[in-house]
Each structure stands twice: as C-alpha cells, then as structure tokens.
Amino acid sequence: MKKTYAVITGASSGIGMAFARQLAAEGYRLVLIARRENRLQALAEELNKSGTESMIITADLSEKEACYRLMQQLEPVPVGILINNAGFGDCGSFLETDADKEMQMIDVNVKAMHLLMKLMLRRMEKQEGGYILNVASSAGLLPAGP
C-alpha cells in the first residue's frame, strides 16, 4: 500500500471511477469525491473488499465554499495525487439550453478545477512533491454547448 492518497473528484462514475479502480490496483489509498453519496459508498465498498483503503467525501464543487471545505477536510491526509475530474456537460441549441445550468457547468468545469489545482499545488509545493491531473473533455470543441 502506498503511503500517500490519490484524491479523485468526480469519482462516482465514468472516468473518475475508472481512475479509482486503476489506482487501487496500483496500491494507492483513495479519497473519493462526488455529489452522490450512495454511488461513492458503493465504490468504496467494492474497493475496500479488494484491500484498498478508501474514504469518501460528498461535495458539490459548483459551490466555491465546498472547494475550501474539501481542502480543509484533506489537511490531515497525505495527498500525493489529485485527479481533478469533476465535470459535466450539456447539449442542445445555445439559445435553448438553460443558462443557470451553464453557469453551474462553468462553476464545476472551470472554477472548481482552477481553485482546487491552485490550493493543492500550494500544498504540494510545501511538501515538495505530488502530481495533479486535470481531466477535460473534447466535448468543449464541439458546437453543441458552451
């Protein structure tokens, strides 16, 4: 088992879940973060059965204060990797998509990723090491959404 934890946002499904399973197979301890506690709990139970130490934190990263709370919760945790994976998209005609949903999307996909990267990078600089992976989608290159 590795000494440090891998922190994964958006861990409850898709790419985040795949990262969790892969890093567990490589011996990392995990901090799994997402909005849906039931999905996080199911993943943590699956990984714990295979001997992986994992903890879950529910957070809505569209809220700036949730990012700061998350970093406070991580203070006692030896973090070696941050996988900044939380995000979502929307599709449809620009004039027909919901503006509030788009603002929330920007809050998660851009602002939360930026803030968590900045705060974790400061921490990693003090501890003289660590890795950050920011996950993005090619969907941003398509004409379907903001």
Describe each PLM feature range.
Residues Y5, S12-S13:
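Conserved glycine-rich cofactor-binding loop
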Residues E26-L43:
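Conserved glycine-rich Rossmann-like NAD(P)H-binding loop of the short-chain dehydrogenase/reductase
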Residues N38, T58-R69, A99:
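The beta1-alpha1 cofactor-binding region of Rossmann-like NAD(H)/NADP(H)-dependent oxidoreductases
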Residues I83, L116-M120:
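Hydrophobic positions on the long internal alpha-helix
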Residues N85-D90:
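Conserved NAD(P)H cofactor-binding loop of Rossmann-fold oxidoreductase domains
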Residues S93-L95, K101-I106:
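Substrate-binding pocket helix/loop in short-chain dehydrogenase/reductase
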Residues S137:
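Residue(s) in the substrate-gating loop at a strand-loop-helix junction
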